[in-house]
Amino acid sequence: HREPMLLVDNVEVDGDWVNATYTVKGDEHFLQGHFPGMPVVPGVILCEIMAQSCCLLISDLLKENLPLYAGIDKARFKHPAVPGDTISIRATVTQRKGKVVFVEATSKVNDKLCCSGNFSFVLIPKPNNN
């Protein structure tokens, strides 16, 4: 991902897990109108932040492949993220079946759980750009 869709500021990968962060600046396009007078990061954007972190975790598999969302299971939204918050993401690969990778992820603000879910990605070959 690249701007304006890059939603990871910092990342630390250690084998089976990734820790990543994103600081909500307040001027992001997805905050406009969500909600007037009380901007809150939309749940789908929290999921995107976690998904991007998951892809950083499996980056070794992405040299020749692109990860496409296959699904999000058990997504739960517990606490809002607002401008000024730093969202911390932790993700772990739970299983791999052929070209499908399963990852469990959580996002937190100040140790309060914002969102959790089980993500699956299907790896497809990168197109040959010759």
What are these regions (language model features)?
Residues 1-36, 40, 65-66, 78-82, ...:
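Non-catalytic linker/capping segments at the edges of enzyme domains
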Residues 15, 45, 49, 100-102:
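An amphipathic alpha-helix/helix-turn recognition signal
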Residues 53-90, 114-122:
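Hydrophobic beta-strand-centered segment that forms part of the acyl-chain substrate-binding groove
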